[in-house]
Amino acid sequence: MRVTQLSSQSFIFPSPELALREPNGLLALGGDLTAPRLLAAYQRGIFPWFNPGEMILWWSPDPRAVLFPEDLHISRSMRRFIRHCPYRFTLNHAFADVISACATERDEGTWIGRDVQQAYCQLHALGHAHSLEVWLENELVGGLYGVAVGAVFCGESMFSRADNASKSALMVFCHHFTQHGGELIDCQVLNAHTASLGAVEIPRNFFLQQLSQLQFSPLPAECWLPQSLIFHPRCSKDQPFKTPHIRLYPPLAGRLILLKW
């Protein structure tokens, strides 16, 4: 099966069902990173991922890694840490700094080149891409960013420069996201870090069904306003975090070998 070459004159993508099995999820190549094309991709469960300086590649892997916010796994040590958390958290205060940090903090190299950073900063300016920042006093020590598609948040990357900074960021984001009606976080591809936090793999067709419904459930505008976030963990020494419920899915075929978050 051949990979589709995208037209520069159209934002139409091929069906995700046409994606390759190896490499898992490769669907199309070419095109550009303009805001209309990126939005068209995310609305169809497709995302860009490529090495800086090379041709743009578009992916829709099967299975798909997702995190249901209520299933976020919080270890005992993290529970203790968050009770006395030294950080403060903000939303959409320093998007460009967060994506730049995500690009520079990767020892194994990064897919977040300058063109990607500029493209997502444009999405942020248009109100579609968002960041959560973690501060220690006045220093940015952690954060994450991604793209909102209705009640789905497509997580792109996160970084940490201090103990538990990225984990704290995800905890605070999940709380804020669900408080405003968010239902699903797209992690795209599974890795050890996201799996340890509760991300799971589900069949692509199930993910696309969820996306097709939830993208038409926009969250209230105040969800994404620049703001400081205060997180009150739902636990104490005598009241643990709730136990995640178990979800069952059809059998999964194939495993991902890609790493992203």
From Swiss-Prot:
One of its GO terms (cellular component) is cytoplasm. One of its GO terms (biological process) is protein catabolic process. InterPro entries: Acyl_CoA_acyltransferase, Leu/Phe-tRNA_Trfase, Leu/Phe-tRNA_Trfase_C, Leu/Phe-tRNA_Trfase_N. Its EC number is 2.3.2.6. Keywords: Acyltransferase, Cytoplasm, Transferase. GO terms for molecular function: leucyl-tRNA--protein transferase activity. It comes from the Bacteria. It holds the Pfam family Leu_Phe_trans. It catalyses: N-terminal L-lysyl-[protein] + L-leucyl-tRNA(Leu) = N-terminal L-leucyl-L-lysyl-[protein] + tRNA(Leu) + H(+); N-terminal L-arginyl-[protein] + L-leucyl-tRNA(Leu) = N-terminal L-leucyl-L-arginyl-[protein] + tRNA(Leu) + H(+); L-phenylalanyl-tRNA(Phe) + an N-terminal L-alpha-aminoacyl-[protein] = an N-terminal L-phenylalanyl-L-alpha-aminoacyl-[protein] + tRNA(Phe). The keyword Glycosyltransferase does not apply. SUPFAM superfamilies: Acyl-CoA N-acyltransferases (Nat). It is an enzyme of class 2 (transferase). It is found in: Cytoplasm. Its main location: cytoplasm. NCBIfam families: aat (TIGR00667). Belongs to the L/F-transferase family. Functions in the N-end rule pathway of protein degradation where it conjugates Leu, Phe and, less efficiently, Met from aminoacyl-tRNAs to the N-termini of proteins containing an N-terminal arginine or lysine. This is Leucyl/phenylalanyl-tRNA--protein transferase. The gene is aat.
